[in-house]
Amino acid sequence: MKNFLQQINSYIKEAFNAGKYLYNGLSVTFDHLRRRPVTVQYPYEKLIPSERYRGRIHYEFDKCIACEVCVRVCPINLPVVDWVMNKETKKKELRNYSIDFGVCIFCGNCVEYCPTNCLSMTEEYELATFDRHNLNFDNVALGRLPTNVTTDPSVKPLRELAYLPKGVMDPHEIPASDTRVGKLPEEVYDWMRPESNKNKDKVSNSNN
């Protein structure tokens, strides 16, 4: 009789522990059911980076003293500092400064150790290009002020239009006659070309 009661007691404890574990797991699941979706339909929707986000590096040419500290602290010796020694002033004269963001790991060491604070991290993260050589930014491109995501014109319409219609991002079972959500590279190129060049192409095609 005593062994029977002990077995029942152990069975009840195991059932209680199993129910407790099940409750803990389902509580997390049900908690997420009450939340809004967190999926971001990029590039139609964009996230606002945090204050310490390590995005594209901003460079101030006038502050740089060509000390090359950024090159020494970089794990891959990435920044290219082109300078010459001025024999009259016996000081370095900076000619060009460049960073290849196709190789950069955005560790922030160059910004941390710069003695003149001529380097800073921005919130700009849209660096995609059709040619990888375009990711090599010189001092002019690095000196360009970053685009603020909060004032980006492509973000504002989404606040007004809320979410895109259902199925607009789904690539399956869409007729070939329907227009694409985005444009192909050649379509963007045609859109950016001047009207005079387009008219010349039309005339040449008609003559052929």
Swiss-Prot record:
GO terms for molecular function: 4 iron, 4 sulfur cluster binding; iron ion binding; NADH dehydrogenase (ubiquinone) activity; quinone binding. GO terms for cellular component: plasma membrane-derived thylakoid membrane. Keywords: 4Fe-4S, Iron, Iron-sulfur, Membrane, Metal-binding, NAD, NADP, Plastoquinone, Quinone, Repeat, Thylakoid, Translocase. Its main location: membrane. It is found in: Cellular thylakoid membrane. [4Fe-4S] cluster 1 binds at residues 64, 67, 70, 114. Binds 2 [4Fe-4S] clusters per subunit. One of its GO terms (biological process) is photosynthesis, light reaction. It catalyses: a plastoquinone + NADH + (n+1) H(+)(in) = a plastoquinol + NAD(+) + n H(+)(out); a plastoquinone + NADPH + (n+1) H(+)(in) = a plastoquinol + NADP(+) + n H(+)(out). It holds the Pfam family Fer4_7. Belongs to the complex I 23 kDa subunit family. This is NAD(P)H-quinone oxidoreductase subunit I. It comes from Prochlorococcus marinus (strain AS9601). The gene is ndhI.
